[in-house]
Amino acid sequence: IIGGSSKYFKFKENIFHKLYEEILFLSNKYMINVIPSRRTPLAFIERLKKMDLKNIYIFEDQFNPVEYGNLLSEAEVQIVTWDSISMISEAISSGAKTLIFPFEENSCPKRYKNFYDRIIEENFISIYNRNLQAPTPDLNKYNSELKSKILNKIESNLSFKLNES
């Protein structure tokens, strides 16, 4: 999943060059689904199309949530540029191994770094590596813990409300 320029990240040409190199490298061994975001420059997508590689599928309909969801759910591994917490969260929620592709580290906001540190610590993701080594997230455990927290919060608010009356 490839993002694009934002308030924090400029996505300069050297970043796209690195992405091309990695896509080319991985396509020699794996089928690659390239999912650009609405912020991904058209020139990058067009350049990928011109490469005409047999193991690359470029998802072009960003307004088709069904196909987007299918691509996420069918993949064994997700590689996501780290410029969007939402894209990373969607990749993790697919249950596949997720790797984030860092760049422009100096312009990365502290809250983003805190998010990355937390999800790495929780074994949800790894930093991109060519071996595609990453943990498989245990979403059942996470969802169970989240459910307990939500129910406890609701319960504590209910008892507070009942005591007020």
Identify the function of each model-found stretch:
Residues 1-42:
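Active-site donor-nucleotide binding/catalytic segment of nucleotide-sugar enzymes
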Residues 6-7, 38-42, 62-66, 85-87:
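Short, catalytically relevant binding-site loops at active-site mouths
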Residues 29-30, 75, 95:
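Short, well-ordered alpha-helix to beta-strand connector turns
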Residues 39-52:
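Short, structured helix-loop element that forms part of the nucleotide-activated donor/catalytic region
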Residues 49-86:
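Donor nucleotide-activated moiety binding/catalytic core segment of transferases
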Residues 86-136:
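Catalytic binding pocket for nucleotide-activated donors in carbohydrate/polymer assembly enzymes
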Residues 116-165:
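Leloir-type glycosyltransferase catalytic cores
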